[in-house]
Amino acid sequence: MVSPREVPRPDAAPRADGPSLVAVGIDGSDTAWRALAWACGHARRAGCPVLAVYVSTSGYRDRVVPGTDATAAATTAADAAAQLLRTEVEQTAAGFGMRVGFVHRHGDPARELVTAAREHGADLLVVGTSAQLLHRVAGSLPGKLARCREMPLVVVP
């Protein structure tokens, strides 16, 4: 029998005691605000920053012809919505005594959340649960993120 002291152990990661950056998906829904609150509280206790990631889906932009006024209007509307959301995110984080970075991406939410988190060096991703029935049937964002296994994932109800 091998004693626990004789079992080889992998070297600990440089920051194995907690996250160095917490990324949180934000879309303005109630569950996303709860996820932001959880992420801010966790990051404050861990002594690390928070990165809020907003992904505007491209569905409505794909229905217009590139280079037209409609494409420009759709992009402008998405950017304006992101700016309003950024202001609310910063105010919410300030209530927790935290400053938060903000990234606006376009595309598939699961793919863009993971890509943004990876690009910024996040080692924890926080999202809210899906509130829409269609997401429960067709596949929720948290479910897709859990299957990708890029980093630890917290799903806040």
What are these regions (language model features)?
Residues A46-P49, M98, A122, M151:
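Short glycine/serine/threonine/alanine-rich loop segments
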